[in-house]
Design a protein with these regions (language model features):
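Boundary at the C-terminal end of the N-terminal hydrophobic targeting segment
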Residues: 28-32
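Bacterial N-terminal signal peptides
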Residues: 13-27
Length: 228
């Protein structure tokens, strides 16, 4: 009996230690914060991003608003693959409230990237689809390729129209602005132009031509820093 009690006590201590270790690991893993989001816990990320978003709206901090929406979009997709439609609508809604040119440009650019991502993710669903003449369906899942091209083109054109010489470093909370980035994309207008001319986002060739001509006119030496 004494041997049995000794075994039981030892095993009990082992279990307590094991349980403590499990809770410690869970606690460390779940320490997601807005500053350091852990996307393994998407609901925590969304919770923290929502709180930061509300505060940023009150403070008029557009870069933090964009960062919060970017985090929410990524986290929501890991929970529901079809959440991108909701994320796009949310980005457009918050972007419509902004007043400064640089904020409007950055939000339009991000919205364009999300539309482009949705088209790429669901391109097989729209293969061979052609919408009739008239207004586009409210549900983007019913759009064809041309509808996405038109919307992305419009958003990029608006972004370029309002993009100004605001330092990109002011958007470092949402856009990585290291030394290399600051050298090649010193201003918001440079960043927006580069995204349009890189060709990763679907849009009309005429927009590419327009932006390139205006960039070259602004830089008589022949190129912007990021075009070298």
């Amino acid at each position: 009996m004494k041997i049995q009690r000794t075994f039981d006590n030892g095993f009990g201590r082992f279990l307590i230690t094991l349980i403590s270790m499990v809770f410690t690991v869970m606690s460390i893993s779940a320490s997601s914060t807005f500053e350091k989001p852990d996307f393994a816990y998407p609901r925590d990320v969304i919770r923290d991003a929502d709180a930061a978003l509300a505060q940023a709206v009150k403070a008029g901090d557009a870069p933090v608003q964009l960062l919060a929406l970017m985090q929410k979009t990524k986290a929501a997709e890991s929970i529901d693959a079809d959440s991108l439609k909701t994320s796009i609508a949310e980005v457009l809604r918050y972007g419509a409230r902004l007043k400064t040119p640089d904020a409007k440009a950055m939000f339009n650019l991000y919205a364009a990237e999300l539309y482009n991502k949705y088209r790429m993710d669901y391109r097989w669903n729209m293969s061979g689809r052609t919408l009739p003449e008239g207004p586009r369906p409210a549900d983007i899942a019913e759009w064809d390729r041309d509808a996405f091209t038109q919307v992305v083109d419009s958003l990029l054109a608006e972004a370029w129209e309002v993009a100004d010489d605001t330092s990109l470093e002011q958007w470092s909370k949402a856009v990585k602005a290291d030394r290399l980035t600051r050298t090649y994309y010193p201003a918001v207008c440079d960043f927006v132009a580069s995204k349009i001319l890189e060709g990763d986002l679907i849009h009309s060739p005429s927009l590419t031509t327009k932006v390139r001509e205006q960039v070259l006119a602004k830089h008589p030496e022949g190129s912007a820093p990021w075009m070298t």
